[in-house]
Amino acid sequence: VTMAPVVQLWRRARRTGQLPDPARLAEARQLVGIRHLTLEPRQHRRLRAGLTRPGMRIDFGGIAKGYAAQEALAQLSGLGVSRALVAIGGDISVGQPPPGESGWRVDVAPLDGAKGKPELRLSLREAAVSTSGDAMQAVVIDGIRYSHIVDPRTGVGLEGQRSVTVVASLGATADVLATTLCILGPDRGIALIDQLGKTDRRLAARYVDTDRQVVSKGWSAHLAASGRPPAAVVTP
């Protein structure tokens, strides 16, 4: 969440078609890191966040939509609405399925994000799904394709094209893990999902790029056959 100074430089790069200035990028990277973020307990189980360096900013891009969908679903449940689907961009949270259905049908868009051409279909109940990728937000500079997803280890936008879809019990979990897998890559990313899946039975993921597709152990349990139109489409 402290990546905002670096992310801002890459947003400008997508607008101008020019790579971030190396000196400014180096300065921005000095403002990144959880060590520069303080959390102070407050009343009612709340925390007060503090930024210890001038120029620091917070960016919730890797978790906000998933969390918002999760909380919206919780609010509906609190009002007695148990059968619901909340979609915010590429992040979806679902409750109990529609009457007579085993789950909510959610289509996953292909790597290039093409509309009307779903690559596969999921069936979900009381779960969340998030897709992270760069089909819609990338820039090509000097023949290299840079994603809007920035690797915090290097401060550089990910190169190439990829799409990660994660199913989890909670929207925030699905959202943050989808972004994390984009950065870690298929081997380390899917290994992480398989490990975490031991404590979240719904957790599963699919990583696809221009060369290959890798899925976690529990992925196939969420697949659905084609049939009636989907309730939503999750896009990168």
What residues fall within each predicted segment?
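Mature catalytic core of soluble alpha/beta enzymes
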Residues: 1-236
